[in-house]
Amino acid sequence: MKGEFMANGPPDVDLIITGDRVIDPSSGLDGPAQIHVTNGKIVSLSDDLPLQSASRHIDATGMIVCPGLIDMHVHVYEWVTNFGLPADDAGVNSGATTIIDQGSAGPWTVGGLKAYVADPAITDVRCFVSANVAGALMGGMEGIVLHNPGMMRIDAIVNSALDYPGFVVGIKSHGEAGGISHWGTEVLEMAVKAAEESKLPLYVHTGELFPVDEQNRPVPASLMERVLPLLRPGDTVAHVYSNMPDGIMGPGDEVPAVVRDAYASGIHFDIGYGINFSYRIARSMMEADILPNTIGSDVHADFNCYHDDSKLDYSMCGAITRLCALGMPLADVISRATLNPARILGEE
């Protein structure tokens, strides 16, 4: 994992970074420290090496120094999907050293994502493979044709995890009004089964995405009662601060009991920032002690803004800034952007 901190390392270092605020969630450090780098890797933290013992010194006084940010939600299958960004624009150029593409590639197309996007990138790119075989080639309303039960192959999902270990690190599915109005929870149930067989976590989009069959529109207040009980501890739901009436919060002003229960059970909540963030909903959820476990930016091309009360920039650092503005301590936010996702990826 790029940006990794190791507890102790050899005394010979190539680079010393000195900072008056170094935040390392894995050790609990939040204060002045030296960072020692050898062969491009951080090997130790201390404050007692002479600066002349390294060939290079960076003075990071007045800056925040932390492990590389891990963005749990991006879309970077450029030229194959109609909403993919260049990987390094979503990654290192935006402050994230590791990014997780969420469902742009399916089991039949994931090889191209690795060969033509991940491998050439400076950024460490991983993916949650789409539950449908082709992936999310078309975003928004047009994409529904790809996400019906006939496009699901559990064996293909499992094989993609076996073929690309360490790159395919999870499965992406949907628990939203459009798909459920057409097929109920069948697609999500198949995704859960694939996740169980492949021993991978599931990441689930919430909030309306695909066209709704109005004759079968799910009741917004009870939609999450159909979705969340299907998930397992360690799975993740996205867009937890969305203002969509059929999102996590529902149409009311109180956090539903099923949401509280899911959070308490160990289901992870990801901010899924992008076009699905509302300060109003965020405040309500935070007042109920529902805080995001991870911070995904959901950066992708061609945004249409559906949020109700804020103009957003769609970046990992933008999401971090908003959470700090809502009162979360910076060290806590950094932990949710580094240590927590590293644990989900099994790379703590």
Task: Annotate each predicted stretch with a short phrase.
Residues 66, 116-128, 194-199, 262:
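Alpha-helix-loop-beta-strand connector modules within alpha/beta enzyme cores
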Residues 5-66:
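Histidine-rich, glycine-flanked metal-binding segment
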